[in-house]
Amino acid sequence: KSTVWGMSFRRGVPGVFEGEGPDAPFTPGSGVRKVGKAKRGVTGTRVRYWPDRQIFLPDAKLSWSKLADRARQTAFLVPGLEIVITDERGIQTDPETGDVLETVSETMRFDGGISEFAEYLATDQPVNNVMRLQGETSFTETVPMLDENGGMTPTDVDRDLGVDIALRWGTGYDTTVRSFVNIIATPKGGTHVQGFEQGLLRAFSAGLEGTRILKSSEEIVKDDVLEGMTAVVTVSLAEPQFEGQTKE
């Protein structure tokens, strides 16, 4: 949101989600002001923005496919959340009645969450049902905190960590891993993906140990485990550390 707002010359923040309500326009240099009241019992916020033409070319257009992909991704990551995306740029109306003749709209809701996400991402035939791995733990992190003298002091802080993973294997050879931290995509992976892959390798190695599936001279490697796998790895924790605005 901060990036979108930074590249807009005007943002409108009406006080209600649907219907009429007070509009609070913001432009570069404008301050906060009271513009009106919403009716009792009416809740929600609708946010609009207008692209800054000093940044974008006059013929720049929003990509429907990219917006739909992002909305679908969020719907997968938040089970039960319903997102409706509608393109009103090319609406055709009846010249006599004014009725809408054609519009593009898609409703997205996935109660199965990332299990459905893994099935959606997979491009091959499954060899097993989607497996779900979930867990919670806590850890201690040392962070600089402001002390009573105005200085920064290293302080131990307890953090809670949640992990939710959906994975399946298919008949293909490609590996697809999509990872997220607090529903923010991490396209280049990170320590959470490295830990997942290492843990998966250890689990397979331990499971095969003592069996006759592998010869004594053979050992399983990471590529053996990841081949044909589709996985969605999600982590939730307070104050994650990203590298830059791209959340890498």
Predicted regions and their residues:
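Short, non-transmembrane amphipathic alpha-helical segments
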Residues: 66-70, 200, 248
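GHKL/Bergerat-fold ATPase module in large chromosome/replication-associated machines
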Residues: 86-241
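GHKL-type ATPase core
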Residues: 1-112, 116
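Short, polar/flexible loop-turn hinges at active-site or ligand-entry regions and domain interfaces
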Residues: 53-63, 187, 214-215, 243
